[in-house]
């Protein structure tokens, strides 16, 4: 059994990791840290885990993380890079759900996250954890930077088009919506029920920290210049993400051939569903699952292709993707512990 530790087990991605790993056939939950909740049984904070998780939260200095096989960091940015060197030296693998190991460009990281990077030497070996586009590197990795939720949808939605060279890569548009859980569990006025309920707004229009991450990865898929206009929105739901991606076609290609690009790219992917051309995927069709659904449109048969992408921001957009990476890193079936059917209604 793989001995797993979780640093930061009280946030939404932390409890989602607990939910997924509690029933994973190859995992033994060993340590869950929270300085504030030290000594509190996990099931007392999260009754949904009663009978499934019998651990108590422990302060980080008390947790025997170096005795684990892998440690997940479901923490604010900056925590993983402070602890990763010691864990790696002890032979422990690291999966960070924050941004510490996503960006190879240190200057971009420090600009957008407003903190210095304390172990830039580890960035060279850190694997970017978007499995469908980086599977081989993840298999061999000691440390993985889990992708952001928005970048996951943008990259998977645009990759087949960029790799085929059929769109103008310099003018990509991403219009993305996320549920409120994407903002985390911290107390914040903008996510209070009376503020977020019955409301819909854009944010980060002049610049968002997921833009440099997405651009860095998209540029690896094409030799062309890549430009991205990305606007995120907050919508009044708990879970779910819907990204509408626009690109101008530069090649004479029919709709069947466009569809074939995506079916060829993702036809064998267990967690990507390429829906029939012209479909309208709904966020609820992925709720509480590791599935991501994609559908293509071509308005008026013109030169614009529209890609619709939906996922659960806490699962494929965060914790589920991290578990998918863990499975690869330990030579397990990639789908282990992740074959949950989406919850409806």
UniProtKB/Swiss-Prot annotation:
Recorded hits in SMART domains, A to Z, give: Semialdhyde_dh
Specify the superkingdom. Bacteria
Catalytic activities: N-acetyl-L-glutamate 5-semialdehyde + phosphate + NADP(+) = N-acetyl-L-glutamyl 5-phosphate + NADPH + H(+)
User: What is the E.C. number?
Assistant: 1.2.1.38
What are the record's GO terms for cellular component? Answer: cytoplasm
- Annotated InterPro entries: AGPR_AS, AGPR_type-1, NAD(P)-bd_dom_sf, NAGSA_dehydrogenase, Semialdehyde_DH_NAD-bd
Q: Which BP terms in the Gene Ontology apply to this protein?
A: L-arginine biosynthetic process
Q: Which family does it belong to?
A: Belongs to the NAGSA dehydrogenase family. Type 1 subfamily.
What's the protein called, per UniProt? N-acetyl-gamma-glutamyl-phosphate reductase
């Amino acid at each position: 059994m793989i001995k797993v530790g979780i640093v930061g087990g009280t946030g939404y991605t932390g409890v989602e990791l607990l939910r997924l790993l509690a029933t994973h056939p190859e995992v033994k939950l060993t340590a869950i840290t929270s300085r504030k909740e030290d000594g509190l049984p996990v099931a007392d904070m999260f009754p949904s885990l009663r009978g499934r998780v019998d651990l108590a939260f422990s302060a980080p200095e008390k947790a025997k993380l170096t005795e684990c096989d892998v440690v997940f960091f479901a923490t604010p940015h900056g925590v993983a890079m402070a602890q990763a060197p010691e864990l790696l030296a002890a032979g422990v693998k690291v999966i960070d759900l924050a941004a510490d190991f996503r960006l190879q460009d240190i200057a971009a990281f420090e600009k957008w996250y407003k903190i210095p990077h304390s172990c830039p030497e580890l960035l060279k070996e850190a694997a970017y954890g978007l499995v469908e586009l980086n599977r081989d590197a993840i298999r061999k990795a000691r440390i993985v930077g889990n992708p952001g939720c928005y970048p996951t949808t943008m990259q998977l939605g645009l990759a087949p088009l960029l790799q085929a060279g059929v769109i103008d890569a310099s003018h990509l548009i991403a219009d993305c919506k996320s549920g409120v859980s994407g903002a985390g569990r911290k107390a914040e006025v903008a996510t209070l029920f009376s503020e977020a309920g019955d409301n819909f707004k854009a944010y980060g229009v002049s610049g968002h920290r997921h833009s440099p991450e997405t651009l860095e990865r998209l540029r690896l898929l094409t030799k062309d210049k890549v430009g991205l206009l990305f606007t995120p929105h907050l919508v009044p739901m708990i879970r779910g993400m819907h990204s509408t991606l626009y690109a101008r076609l530069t090649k004479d290609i029919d709709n069947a051939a466009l569809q074939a690009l995506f079916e060829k790219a993702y036809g064998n992917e267990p967690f990507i569903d390429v829906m029939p051309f012209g479909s309208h995927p709904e966020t609820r069709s992925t709720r509480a699952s590791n599935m991501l659904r994609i559908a293509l449109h071509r308005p008026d048969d013109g030169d614009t292709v529209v890609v619709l992408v939906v996922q659960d921001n806490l699962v494929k957009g965060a914790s589920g993707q991290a578990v998918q990476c863990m499975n690869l890193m330990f030579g397990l079936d990639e789908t282990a512990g992740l074959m949950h059917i989406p919850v409806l209604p």
